[in-house]
Swiss-Prot record:
UniProt KW Ribonucleoprotein keyword: yes
Coiled-coil portions: none
Species of provenance: Hippocampus comes (Tiger tail seahorse)
Keyword Membrane belongs to the record: no
Source species, domain of life: Eukaryota
Entry-linked SMART domains: KOW (SM00739)
Cellular compartment(s): Cytoplasm, Cytosol; Cytoplasm; Rough endoplasmic reticulum
Family the entry assigns: Belongs to the eukaryotic ribosomal protein eL27 family.
Residue span(s) of domain KOW: 5-40
An example molecular function term from Gene Ontology annotations: structural constituent of ribosome
InterPro entries with a match to the protein in the record: KOW, Ribosomal_eL27, Ribosomal_eL27_CS, Ribosomal_eL27_KOW, Ribosomal_eL27_sf, Translation_prot_SH3-like_sf
Chief location: cytoplasm
Gene Ontology BP annotations: erythrocyte differentiation; translation
Protein name: Large ribosomal subunit protein eL27
Length: 136
């Protein structure tokens, strides 16, 4: 069987606090490591999706409704469901990596980086499916 958990692949989070949220794989570790002896992936995802925007709304209201809250987390493959979609959002690997979980300041910086990149992509109007809440 081929390896399909690759960076850029959109996944659904199945377990935990962010269950039902969409995320994108930043880095995949198929063979596991010493501290995590199972296959896992570093993902960046959307915690709070942008709200619906209509034509009569003003600029300020649209700006407020277009905000996204992001998360960065390491997940076991068992808790991720891959989709057929992939997005090419260029997250800075020096900011978003596995080392951020040791220091809260680095983690918030990584979260901010993901938020900025997600909002940029959302405003261009590409990858619409990724920025819509999963109805279930």
């Amino acid at each position: 069987m081929g390896k399909f958990m690759k960076p850029g692949k959109v996944v659904m989070v199945l377990a935990g606090r962010y269950a039902g949220r969409k995320a994108v794989i930043v880095k995949n570790i198929d063979d596991g490591t010493a501290d995590r002896p199972y296959s896992h992936a570093l993902v960046a995802g959307i915690d709070r999706y942008p709200r619906k925007v209509t034509a009569p709304m003003g600029k300020k209201k649209i700006a407020k409704r277009s905000k996204i809250k992001a998360f960065v987390k390491v997940y076991n493959y068992n808790h991720l469901m891959p989709t057929r979609y992939s997005v090419d959002i260029p997250l800075d690997k020096t900011v978003v990596n596995k080392d951020v979980f040791r220091d809260p300041a680095l983690k918030s910086k990584a979260r901010r980086e993901a938020k900025v990149k997600f909002e940029e992509r959302y405003k261009t109007g590409k990858n619409k499916w990724f920025f819509q809440k999963l109805r279930f």
